[in-house]
């Protein structure tokens, strides 16, 4: 299974492509119990946590924008904005995802903020 941002050349070798918003749904529909998830291990781990019945293998890669965000960055942001919601993309490191108020794709973030009533008490979003 290859992430949509994978090179065209690599996609030709894969059985399925996904996006961050469709990864869980697509993986849940695969008959295979073993999935090679490329190239982003952070997104792959996020998907795997939601499907313990499947076995995942990951490629050592990552989105250059998301892998630079650290737990220390989260700590600084929370200190500067203590009442803000922290939204993160599933391609962020696990240490960041674990501290988030919401994890989702860039498409899903604005859509789900109101749907899940996340803004009821806090008005600021990081």
Which residues fall in each region the model found?
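The feature marks the mature, well-folded catalytic cores of soluble enzymes
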Residues: 1-126
